[in-house]
A protein has these predicted regions:
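Compositionally biased, intrinsically disordered low-complexity segments enriched in Pro/Arg/Gln/His
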Residues: 9-16
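Hydrophobic alpha-helical segments
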Residues: 16, 22-215
């Protein structure tokens, strides 16, 4: 495990309310660092991309897509890649959702974890596996391919390298197409985690954090 030390963030500044009183930013509802656009605020191109996303399998525009909508050409291309990575790869949904949770855990991405934990459970990833991943404990895998996906992604992130033996094993189990898809999922959800982190996109108010205290 690679441990990094961060400076404690400064206390958020106080701000003046509409009535003139001072209040600390911590007492106000959480707001992301960029405004999330309402349809009435969108340009014609933004509205077009918004409607494309909302009419697809996601059914709505939220999270990183809401940030990317400020750059509609980016949003259009990213949502197409995301649709492939989430719905159209050669991997079973059980493995793709497991891989997404591994990425969320690596990045400590509360939003990504919140959004995909129920999807992983629905796809057949066991609750004990998810709990162990969250807590940094040995994972009681239900299937050997889950262990291999976890190992592959962990080694890739910790060493920035894939040894020949590991590559051969993952190709043997997932096939060459499956490995390409797995790397694509990892890359796409890294982009998502970075976007969520930089622009401070959080789960809905009242959602308890699950990853902040993980080792």
């Amino acid at each position: 495990v690679i441990c990094l030390k961060y400076r404690t963030p400064a206390q958020p500044p106080s701000r003046r309310t509409a009535g003139g009183a001072l209040e600390n930013a911590m007492s106000t509802p959480h707001l992301p660092r960029v405004p999330l656009l309402e349809p009435a605020q969108m340009s014609p191109e933004q509205k077009r991309i918004h409607d494309v996303i909302a009419s697809g399998p996601r059914g709505q525009v939220r999270g990183p897509l809401a940030v990317w909508l400020h750059r509609p050409a980016m949003a259009e291309r990213a949502q197409a890649l995301g649709q492939y990575c989430r719905y159209e790869t050669s991997l079973p949904t059980r493995l793709s959702e497991w891989a997404i949770l591994v990425m969320a855990r690596h990045w400590r991405s509360e939003y990504e974890w919140w959004a995909h934990k129920p999807l992983a459970l629905k796809a057949g990833v066991s609750a004990p596996m998810i709990d162990a991943l969250r807590n940094g404990e040995p994972v009681p895998y239900s299937h050997p391919d889950e262990a291999l996906v976890h190992e592959f992604l962990t080694v890739l992130h910790e060493t920035r390298h894939t040894p020949d033996d590991l590559y051969r094993r993952v190709v043997h189990v997932l096939g060459e197409a499956g490995v390409i898809d797995l790397v694509s999922i990892a890359g796409y959800y890294t982009l998502i985690a970075m976007t969520l982190g930089v622009f401070d996109i959080q789960p809905p108010e009242g959602t308890p954090p699950e990853l902040g205290g993980a080792a």
